[in-house]
A protein has these predicted regions:
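Short, Lys/Arg-enriched N-terminal segments with co-localized hydrophobic residues
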Residues: 3-16
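An N-terminal, well-structured beta->alpha segment
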Residues: 22-117, 212-244
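Ferredoxin-reductase
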Residues: 23-28, 95-172
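Gly/Ser/Thr-enriched, mixed-charge loops and adjacent short helices
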Residues: 48-53, 57, 165-253
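Short, glycine-/Ser/Thr-/acidic-enriched flexible segments
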Residues: 64-66, 71-73, 107, 135, ...
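Residues on a specific face of well-ordered alpha-helices
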Residues: 85, 115, 119, 138, ...
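Generic, well-ordered alpha-helical scaffold segments in large soluble proteins
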Residues: 86-90, 120, 124, 143, ...
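Single conserved hydrophobic/aromatic residue that forms the stacking wall/gate
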Residues: 251-261
Length: 261
């Protein structure tokens, strides 16, 4: 987490800036209908307000991760927009295809956060390749390399409890973003106002403008072929008549698993 949103005035007294930030959110015309009732519910609760607004989620090599909800210290569409604007500012300095791949898991609001990130990138003139359904992290890594993207975004909180969600960033090699790149993105995030600083267009607008496209079957087929090529004993399950029971414990898989057997 970053520095507290608190400063000392010229008399040395601590000014609780988090209260001002809370009031700004409370007065704002928030697009996510879930946030305003949540903010109203904590009015007058200084401990709760401080927990949500005295600090902000910090972007690092593992991206962001936090509890869903209203505030700078929570995962919501505004924190996602802010983070994506920081990433977009970095991508625009990298040349190349100016493209970012996006995937997401089945956690609460993962699809919303993924489309929100796509809208910020598109508003910055950056092309997006996003999966049309939830796919696991390796699929995001593969798409990042397949389309020769500058970066990849995976909306997931890995093994954390259901109340969490997260935002992971990957480099052009499909691996976790390096320390140096993450530090630059974090600096750009710090320059971006969480409520108003990010450029943004709707997902539908991005699709209409041709900036947002879904990951194609060519990429998916290449992914499955790459996995199948690494089988130690191809076709063993089918020839042996084995029946497999699969449970997705970490929220990140779906239909793709039916094909890889």
């Amino acid at each position: 987490m970053n520095l507290s949103i608190m400063v000392k005035n010229n008399k040395g007294k601590v000014c609780n800036m988090y209260q001002d930030e809370y009031k700004r959110w409370l007065a704002a015309d928030l697009e996510d209908a879930d946030l305003k009732p949540e903010l109203a519910k904590i009015e007058g609760n200084d401990d709760e307000i401080k927990d949500r607004f005295a600090v902000a989620l910090k972007f690092g090599t593992a991206g962001l991760r936090g509890v869903l909800g209203a505030g700078t210290n929570r995962m919501n569409i505004y924190v996602v927009r802010q983070a994506t604007q920081g990433l977009a500012n970095w991508v625009k300095t990298q040349g190349g295809n100016q493209t970012v791949a996006i995937s997401y898991d089945s956690r609460l609001k993962s699809d919303i956060f993924a489309k929100t990130a796509a809208g910020v990138l598109a508003a910055n003139g950056i092309k997006v390749r996003i999966y049309d359904a939830l796919m696991p992290v390796p699929a995001l890594s593969f798409a990042t390399r397949y389309y020769e993207c500058n970066a990849g975004i995976m909306v997931t909180a890995s093994h954390n409890p259901a109340k969490y969600n997260g935002y992971k960033a990957y480099g052009p090699d499909g691996c976790q973003m390096t320390d140096d790149a993450a530090a630059i993105v974090y600096d750009e995030i710090q320059k971006t106002d969480v409520l108003t600083g990010a450029k943004y267009i709707s997902f539908a607008e991005g699709v209409e403008q041709g900036l947002i496209r879904f990951v194609g079957d060519d990429c998916k087929n290449a992914l499955y072929a790459a996995i199948e090529a690494r089988q130690v004993r191809p076709g063993l399950c089918k020839t042996a008549g084995l029946k497999l029971v699969y449970s997705c414990l970490l929220y990140t898989s779906d239909a793709a698993d039916d094909r890889i057997s």
